[in-house]
Regions:
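Ankyrin repeat arrays, specifically the small/polar loop and inter-repeat linker segments at the C-terminal end
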Residues: 287-295, 320-327, 340, 350-363
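Ankyrin-repeat helical register
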Residues: 302-303, 329, 333
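Repeat-mediated protein-protein interaction surfaces in helical alpha-solenoids
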Residues: 271-288, 310-312
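Extended, charge-rich intrinsically disordered regulatory tails
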Residues: 323, 366-371
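Extracellular beta-strand-rich solenoid/capping regions of secreted or surface-exposed proteins
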Residues: 48-50
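Ankyrin repeat structural motif
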Residues: 308-316, 338-347, 354
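Structural signature of tandem-repeat unit edges
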Residues: 2-3, 9-21, 28-46, 58-131, ...
Length: 371
């Protein structure tokens, strides 16, 4: 689990939940992307504490630290200030068995940054975490992606408050497994893409959850308020049963979403379901395909910007794109100096549109002979 962090130094502050389990309180590192280890100091990481990735006051309980650097671990007692550290050392009466580190000492290390708020960008949580505390990622305005496992079932209030750049949520689970995704989505009202990925990185399903808005209307002089919900994102977030996502219910939202949502929302909704078509019934497939064909120009533009060959080939192979569009794509890829894309597109044109080309050549020959 720590292979991703091997080249850097990491500091973890934590407290005991039990003898074998801990709650993570703070993380310091050299990079804005971090993989939280499954075990620290021989104890299983079970929870993210309140305000874990936010610059807030630490709890008053006994706090321990663990330092990871170059594949080696060091652990000991954490104190808030050097003065407290000196008092602790004095009280040990020369017993140097316990390492003691202060917050001031950590902050003096020029390589280390507190992974919080405007610095943290991506977090990979370990498999055994069951809880994210309240406001754990409060004000992490630069965070773009978080990866979690199915054991995570409890998410505290406002866990992702002001994390408006968080647009990607990776579930390291199968789409038919019970997970805590519903609890996570309840804390993310803005648009977010969720991918269900296996250990080999294969995406089993990718779902887009649109943004939704809440407003209240006052009814009469009794000060009774009626909740109004705008956007299909709320309904999409309710498509679960016993922690398992109901794909059919999610697909049934699309026709109404076509009325309320913009193309920027509908295109990834439709494309993701077609490209990772896990549990996709024929009627839903037909609705998604109709929309993708209607928006084929915009879809192609998005795919070309990503420079990914597999989805681009899928687009033309399934007949969502026309012959003139693949010719336009060749011109665009050439202009952008994407030579791999140019070569692939030319090959696909010959392979997928050969019959059209031959028919056109025959017609041209007959027309020339008649002339």
């Amino acid at each position: 689990m720590m292979e991703e962090n091997r080249a850097e130094q990491l500091f973890f502050l934590w407290e005991k939940i039990s003898e074998g389990e801990i709650r993570l309180l703070r993380v310091f590192g050299e990079q804005p992307v971090v993989t939280v280890p499954g075990f620290i100091d021989g104890r299983c990481v079970r929870e993210l504490g309140d305000y874990c990735f936010s610059r807030r006051k630490l709890p008053e309980n006994e706090i321990r630290y663990s330092r990871y650097c170059g594949g080696m671990w060091e652990s000991g007692l954490f104190v808030s200030k050097d003065k407290v550290k000196n008092n602790c050392i004095a009280s040990e009466q020369g017993n140097a068995a316990e390492n003691i580190v202060s917050l001031e000492a950590i902050e003096q290390d020029e390589k280390l940054r507190e992974l919080s708020e405007k610095y943290i960008k991506e977090v990979q949580l370990p498999a055994d975490i069951v809880k994210i505390g309240s406001c754990a990622f409060y004000n992490c305005t630069k965070m773009e992606r978080i990866s979690v496992y199915p054991k995570l079932v409890e998410v505290g209030s406002d866990a992702f408050m002001n994390c408006l750049n968080l647009r990607s949520l990776q579930m390291c689970a199968g789409v038919e497994e019970p997970t805590g995704l519903k609890q996570l989505l309840a804390q993310i009202k803005w648009q977010v893409e969720v991918s269900f990925e296996q250990e080999d990185g294969e995406r089993e399903a990718v779902l887009l959850y649109p943004e939704y808005y809440e407003s209240y209307d006052e009814i009469g002089p009794a000060h009774i308020f009626e909740l109004n919900l705008t956007g299909e994102g709320f309904r999409a977030r309710q498509c679960f049963k016993d922690g398992v996502i109901l794909l059919n219910a999610y697909d049934e939202i699309f026709p109404q979403a076509c009325v309320e949502e913009s193309a920027e929302v509908l295109i990834p909704m439709a494309w993701n379901r077609l490209y990772t078509a896990c549990g996709l019934p024929p009627e839903a497939r037909a609705a998604y395909e109709t929309y993708v064909r209607e928006q084929s120009g915009k879809v192609l533009t998005i795919l070309l910007k990503k420079r990914e060959l597999k989805p681009l080939h899928f687009f033309f192979e399934k007949g969502y794109g026309r012959k003139e569009q693949i010719e336009d794509a060749v011109a665009i890829a050439s202009h952008e100096e994407w030579m791999e894309g140019v070569a692939s597109l030319i090959a696909w044109k010959r392979q997928l549109f050969a019959e059209q080309t031959e028919t056109a050549d025959v017609r041209s020959r007959y027309a020339f002979e008649e002339f």
